[in-house]
Amino acid sequence: MAAGIGTIAHGNDIGGSLRWPAHCNGVVTIKPTQGRVPAYNESAAAERPMPAHLMSAQGPLARSVGDVRLALEAMSQRDPRDPWWVPAPLVGPKPKGPIKVALAKLPDDMDVDASVHAALRQAADALERSGYRVSEVEVPDISGVWQTWCDIITNETVVLQEA
């Protein structure tokens, strides 16, 4: 798709399988909220365990945001074989005030290239000029989350392989 062979592609994401390839290949994606896109898999040997349902998401990849939106709308249609699907609208009511955006302050011990800092500031400035309210926030300590996530994924993978 990034090479121009197709316009829209489908993928799934637990730990970045949509987002990282899109980032590395200069294309656009979104990891939809769980339940937005049906995830029924007729070829699966067994139903996926609940944590796999809660972490995995089906989503589109495309060369433009407009194509991703079009694909997401098509992919979000009801499939009665997926009990996790929810009828969430793609567009909600117009906000009553400015949309709030949190710009995470990077921890002092995190080594981040100056170009990344500049890009984040540039994005925040562009959002503010577009009417968004950008506030810097402290990042909570989530150091233990990564190990917990890895434990869950590892156990889920074992269960799926044994099915």
PLM ranges: what are they?
Residues 19-36:
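Conserved catalytic cores of soluble enzyme domains
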Residues 133-138:
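General small-molecule cofactor/ligand-binding pocket signal
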Residues 1-23, 61-62, 72:
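Active-site-proximal alpha-helical scaffold in enzymes
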Residues 95-104, 152-163:
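Short helix-loop capping/hinge segments that flank enzyme active sites or metal/cofactor-binding pockets
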Residues 31-124, 130, 141:
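A short helix-breaking turn/cap at a secondary-structure junction
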Residues 17-18, 111, 144:
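Generic structural signal for helix capping and beta-alpha/helix-loop junctions
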Residues 14-15, 140-142:
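Conserved beta-strand edge residues that scaffold enzyme active sites
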Residues 23-27, 148-154:
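Short low-complexity, flexible loop/linker segments enriched in glycine and/or proline
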